[in-house]
């Protein structure tokens, strides 16, 4: 399968991966190319910006949760869905080789190796010049299975500064695709779990367009496309949700023809993997969004509810005010309607969140805490194991009956 692609990586976090990757997606789209966006790992926030920049669903490539064997099929699926793209741009995670518990598992390098994707390193040039070439040399030689094909210089102080770094990289045979100057005009707000999601930030579309303009001015887009075209063909069939259900032993549902499933959405619930919706549809369900900030009741005829992730704690007052929907959710739960809740969804089902009344489906209170809980988790029951990921600053406390 022909699949032009690059992976945007860096020596460490905070060097500009998201700025460059998101801006590159926006710039390529503005130039008339169709971009398939991806993020290494389980993160929901960056794909929200990728989606805004590319006009397509932002997708994840997580080998820890999904397994190595699904990385290339998921990449191919995102490349051809909803229509074939011209290039796949994959944003890495942390430093190039950083992964689970220091093993490199799930790292950008692992995804690059598994999918045979050339790597473009974002070099934050602040505080040094030629030394950056030594760092990139280490990245390029640390693992012979990882192809460091190019570099983009970020936060360049002056043309002379950029030329010094580029000269060092040229000695390694690594071309520089662009030099982005230091600028304070591009700012994306952050809070306790990283960037503010694109769906919650009113200026996000304007800022993403600004990133695209910045990249278009300082990065050679044609050179990026040429580098992506060097990626070898993949001998793989795109992941298919219907086939995935069949291989998992799915035998249908007992809810009649085309049952309706509601999925929480809106500013308080922005976290959702597109493959979840695709699998529900492939399983014969109709899917409708429910915004707990504005919708006063669940849709008529609803037979299931999926409450994904987000930041309900940032909207707790408005969620509490919409008591009609909370009452409706609780009534449906008491009547036996299936509900799947994760992360923010669990918080919404508690009785209180930071003192604000929630749906009260579960006899628990939830509250924000200072401690960050982060990492992959494995849940096992009856010899069946499911891998998930925790990333939050909340606690739940069971209440006495």
Give, region by region, the residue ranges found by the protein language model.
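Internal gly/pro-rich beta-alpha loop/helix module
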Residues: 129-251
């Amino acid at each position: 399968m022909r699949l032009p692609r690059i992976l945007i990586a860096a020596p460490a976090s905070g060097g500009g991966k998201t700025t460059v990757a998101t801006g590159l997606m926006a710039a390529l789209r503005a130039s008339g190319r169709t971009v398939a966006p991806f993020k290494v790992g389980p993160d929901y926030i960056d794909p929200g910006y990728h989606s805004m920049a590319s006009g397509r669903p932002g997708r994840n490539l997580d080998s820890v949760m999904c397994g190595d064997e699904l990385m290339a099929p998921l990449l191919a699926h995102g490349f051809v869905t909803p229509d074939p793209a011209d290039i796949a741009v994959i944003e890495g995670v942390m430093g190039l080789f950083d992964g689970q518990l220091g093993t490199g598992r799930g790292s950008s390098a692992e995804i690059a190796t598994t999918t045979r994707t050339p790597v473009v390193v974002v070099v934050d040039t602040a505080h040094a010049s030629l030394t950056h070439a030594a760092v990139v040399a280490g990245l390029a030689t640390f693992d012979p299975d990882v192809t460091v094909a190019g570099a983009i210089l970020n936060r360049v102080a002056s043309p002379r500064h950029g030329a010094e770094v580029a000269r060092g990289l040229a000695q390694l045979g690594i071309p520089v695709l662009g030099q982005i100057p230091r600028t304070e005009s591009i700012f994306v707000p952050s809070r306790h779990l990283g960037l503010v999601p694109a769906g919650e930030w009113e200026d996000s579309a304007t800022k993403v367009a600004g990133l695209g303009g910045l990249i278009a001015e300082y990065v050679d887009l044609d050179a990026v496309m040429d580098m992506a075209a060097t990626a070898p063909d993949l001998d793989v069939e795109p992941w298919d949700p219907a086939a995935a259900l069949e291989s998992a032993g799915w035998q249908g549902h007992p809810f009649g023809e085309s049952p309706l499933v509601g999925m929480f959405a809106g500013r308080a619930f922005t976290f959702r993997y597109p493959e979840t919706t695709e699998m529900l549809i492939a399983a014969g369900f109709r899917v409708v969004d429910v915004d707990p900030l504005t919708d006063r009741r669940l849709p008529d005829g609803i037979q299931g509810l999926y409450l994904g992730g987000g930041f309900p704690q940032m909207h707790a007052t408005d969620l509490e005010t919409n008591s009609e929907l909370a009452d409706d959710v609780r009534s449906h739960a008491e009547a036996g309607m299936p509900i799947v809740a994760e992360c923010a969804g669990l918080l919404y089902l508690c009785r209180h969140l930071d003192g604000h009344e929630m749906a009260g489906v579960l006899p628990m209170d939830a509250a924000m805490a200072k401690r960050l809980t982060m990492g992959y988790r494995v849940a096992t029951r009856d010899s069946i194991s499911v891998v998930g990921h925790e990333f939050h600053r909340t606690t739940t406390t069971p209440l006495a009956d």
